[in-house]
């Protein structure tokens, strides 16, 4: 479960190893049967844009996106393989087709970063590859279970709506409120109206 970053000259630039492998805490199951987890945040540049990489199940841990944000990442490449399951299982249990796109849009908006979310086109698959811009809006999407190439202009200088821009850095530092706290008797009584 690794992603190799290769530059436009064909040189190996970096490697990302999936940090959160699928598997139970007790016992060796699923991914944990075959792989060991990574411990390295993969940050690299493409034409001056700081980029990061993640794999599949890593999306369940928003803390990884926050750490990449702290490292200045503006564009995340998040690779998935939510495909090749039976059509019956996909119909019965396609949480990925709902949860993954919603999570990626939320992570894009919460961290003000572009996210390229690719998935296998092997049918049946849970969802088609897409790009979310820093306000969470999906700017391009491939059809589900069809091979294709998605071309999107990514301009990190463009300005998008960012509801948390004023307080995000404080929250990252552990200050969990906006503005200035006020000491007030009524505010400190938690079990009174």
Q: Which residue ranges define each predicted feature?
A:
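Active-site catalytic loop in hydrolytic enzyme cores
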Residues: 1-79, 84-85, 93-102, 164-170
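CN hydrolase (nitrilase-like) catalytic-core segments centered on the catalytic cysteine
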Residues: 56-148
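Short alpha-helical interface elements
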Residues: 28-41, 69, 78, 84, ...
């Amino acid at each position: 479960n690794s992603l190799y970053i290769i530059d436009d000259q064909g040189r190996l630039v970096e490697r990302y190893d999936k940090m959160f492998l699928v598997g139970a805490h007790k016992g060796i199951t699923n991914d944990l049967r075959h792989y060991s987890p990574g411990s390295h945040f993969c940050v690299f540049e493409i034409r001056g844009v700081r980029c990061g990489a993640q794999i599949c199940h890593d999306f369940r841990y928003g803390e990884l996106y926050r750490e990449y944000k702290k490292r200045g990442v503006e564009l995340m490449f998040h690779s998935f393989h939510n495909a090749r399951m039976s059509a019956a299982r996909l119909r019965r249990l396609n949480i990925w087709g709902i949860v993954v796109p919603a999570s990626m849009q939320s992570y894009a908006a919460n961290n003000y970063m572009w996210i390229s979310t690719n998935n296998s086109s092997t049918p049946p698959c849970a969802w088609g590859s897409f790009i979310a811009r820093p306000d969470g809006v999906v700017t391009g999407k491939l059809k589900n279970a069809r091979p294709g190439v998605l071309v999107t202009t990514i301009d990190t200088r463009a300005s998008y709506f960012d509801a948390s821009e004023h307080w995000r850095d404080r929250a990252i530092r552990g200050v969990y409120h906006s503005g200035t706290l006020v000491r007030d008797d009524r505010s400190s009584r938690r079990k009174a109206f």
